[in-house]
Amino acid sequence: CQQYREERFCQSVKKYAAFFRDYAARHHFVVDGVNVGWLVADYAHPGGNKKTHVSLNHQLAEINFLLNLYLQEGNPTDRELAEIMLNGVVNLGAKWVAPNGDLHYARFPDGSFGRTDYPYLTYNDLRETQRLYRAVYGRDEPVLDQLIRSKRAWMNANGVVNPFPEIGRASCRERV
């Protein structure tokens, strides 16, 4: 946050981070695995009594926000929440991959997966998550690599061109 030298921006980022930490604590699904994981619901139901789906790209975008904030501010709470959220993705692993090799857009409260994913948006989010993961932990996350490779193969097979090829490039070693 400090890199921008804009105090109002920094305060807004910190305010959103505090909101999101609280939101995630109240609106998540537990995903069991070697390390417990959370999938944070995309939206809260107005009545507060109905859980909504978790889209993979939203989960990744929030992980990316938290890891970026951790790298800037050094608050271990941000890294810890990003880690438990990433565990939610990793614990499901190949279940995110649809039969056609694309990724499922979302996981629903009943545990099912579905909806058509964006052509390249989630791919870029995955690459950015991998870049940030490497910056924090010094290595790649293997399940992220698996999802990146599957999405890239689907993109290649379907003629999808990524208009933002530079995203995550510094760290992702794609093997298609």
What are these regions (language model features)?
Residues 70-120, 124, 130-131:
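Surface-exposed substrate-engagement region within the catalytic domains
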Residues 1, 12-17, 60-65, 82-85, ...:
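Small-side-chain structural scaffolding
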Residues 7-34, 77-102, 135-165:
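Long, well-ordered core segments of solenoidal/helical folds
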Residues 5-9, 58-61, 74, 78, ...:
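Structural signature of alpha-solenoid helical repeat junctions
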Residues 168-176:
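Conserved small/polar residues in nucleotide/adenosyl-binding loops
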Residues 45-85:
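Flexible, glycine-rich surface segments
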Residues 29-55, 98-126, 165-169:
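Carbohydrate-binding/catalytic loop surfaces
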Residues 1-2, 53-70, 114-134:
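Well-ordered alpha-helical segments within folded domains of soluble proteins
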